[in-house]
């Protein structure tokens, strides 16, 4: 396993380590407010293609509940779709997750949310400054 600074690492697979641009992409998404598990799953799906939950756990070095939360967020943003694959024998069918577009297309919802957050913060600052200037406080 390859451990990178700030614990934004992806699991090293087949002797291939995560590149610096991949780590920068993940850390930048996290700085924008994206949950780390969500960013890791998005990038793992981009790098490794359609993957099961177990594969995402291994490639992203995260636990199953974290994969589920990340996939739910990615589905909410409509950047991931899932296909059921019949299990061999008994049990629940497993799901294969894949991106709905290119990485560039899939990061758009995250950028839009970050820009909306910026607008909200700027508006709140302006309101706060206006309220603080009034003489009736």
Model-found features: residue ranges?
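N-terminal leader segment of winged-helix/HTH proteins
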Residues: 1-32, 87-88
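Short, cationic-aromatic polyanion-contact patches
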Residues: 28-37, 52, 85-108
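N-terminal helix-turn-helix DNA-binding core of bacterial DNA-binding proteins
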Residues: 29-62
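Basic amphipathic alpha-helical segments that dock to polyanions
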Residues: 45, 56, 67-77
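Short Asp/Glu-rich motifs
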Residues: 48, 76, 93-94
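Glycine-centered, phosphate/nucleic-acid-interacting loop/turn motifs that mediate DNA/RNA or nucleotide
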Residues: 78, 84
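Amphipathic alpha-helical dimerization/coiled-coil segments
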Residues: 102-137
